[in-house]
Amino acid sequence: MAGNLVGSNIANILLVGGIMLFPISKLKIHDQDKSTFIFFLVFSIFFFFLIIFYIAIDIKFAIIFIFLLIIFFYYELKKPIDEDITLSETNDQSSLLIILKIVFSFLILFFSSRYFIEFAKSLTEIFGVAETTIGITIVAFGTSLPEVIATIISIIKKQSNLAIGNILGSNIANIFGITLIAVFLNNEINYFHLLTIIDKWLFLLTSLLFFVIVMLRLTGKILSITLILCYLTYFSYLYM
């Protein structure tokens, strides 16, 4: 779980973010969304301190996580509707149809994920590497594929703000969701010995980098290629 959480967040920012930045010339960031990015950065730093030091995340921390998550969702739902997303895009579909599509997509994702995890476990035996390494690379890359597809679709529709929200939401969900599941299944979890020092610091640095990119609205093919190359270098390093 630890490798998947950190690896997926790193992949979302370096790989998915790199793909997102390649075709666009300008990031559309609304002022109302800046507080969301600040929340992401603050919580990423808070989570970094939980994994860099020998701190057991137990039920008390889980309750705090849930409380923060409720506040986050409440604040996000109170925001005005994005003008870039017109109601005409959803008027032609009933609410029931949309719900059915979401449920069907979730079921496909759930069962495909089970097979993917089994495949990933077999790779640990084939390559003789630790499960954490597989989690940070193969499993994390697999869990980031939906973000890649969603990002490409968002860019095609010329809605870069959706692509950014996709990365942001996925990373926040990873931190909250995976940690909460681990705590409820095992009563507590300690990431200290589950991640290398490089994994921990790269998690923090990529979170800071993502914050700087969106707040300063940085774009360009050079930045895009640099992010992707950084991810490929990190990916290769873990198997050296």
Regions found by a protein language model. Name each.
Residues 1-240:
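Hydrophobic alpha-helical segments, chiefly the membrane-spanning helices
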